[in-house]
């Protein structure tokens, strides 16, 4: 029996696969244009690509931007994509961790304002550097604001105090 499958085509990519890969490079280039300058500095990019990414913000017309992003995609072909993806994953991971910590602090604030002395005791156990008197005062003000349906200025102060304690405990301050 003769097999019609030809082994010569195993290594070649189809036109569709090539287009998918190029489109993925353009999308990665689009993502890079949204990053801040200090974040871009951490990425292993060529000077030509850095210049093209900087110029991308100047192209506002749809056609010009699309054409320029195709150029960025072309420049992306010679980049170390694994290194770029690794740095972007690290950035995403640290951003996720920051957001999770931020939401945890918001939950603490809400429990302290809505809660009782048990919640305050748990908080003080977790954050031993807490100035109880100051925190109780902030909580009391926030509770009064909440009862009177006023804007949450005191609740913001409670959050800021909690965030400062957290940053001090983590050595970020």
Curated annotation (Swiss-Prot):
Sorted UniProt keywords: Cytoplasm, Ribosome biogenesis, RNA-binding, rRNA-binding
Location in the cell: Cytoplasm
Alphabetical list of CDD domains matching this protein: YjgA-like (cd16331)
The organism's place on the tree of life at top rank: Bacteria
GO annotation terms (biological process): assembly of large subunit precursor of preribosome
This protein's GO CC annotations: cytosol
A GO molecular function held by the record: rRNA binding
Pfam family for this entry, one: DarP
Statement: the UniProt record of this protein carries the keyword Metal-binding: no
InterPro entries (alphabetical): DarP (IPR006839), DarP_sf (IPR023153)
Entry keyword annotation includes Lipoprotein: no
UniProt xrefs under HAMAP family: DarP
PANTHER family per UniProt: UPF0307 PROTEIN YJGA
NCBIfam families the UniProt entry points to: PRK05255.1-1
Function of the molecule: Member of a network of 50S ribosomal subunit biogenesis factors which assembles along the 30S-50S interface, preventing incorrect 23S rRNA structures from forming. Promotes peptidyl transferase center (PTC) maturation.
Homology family: Belongs to the DarP family.
Protein name (record): Dual-action ribosomal maturation protein DarP
Organism per entry: Pseudomonas entomophila (strain L48)
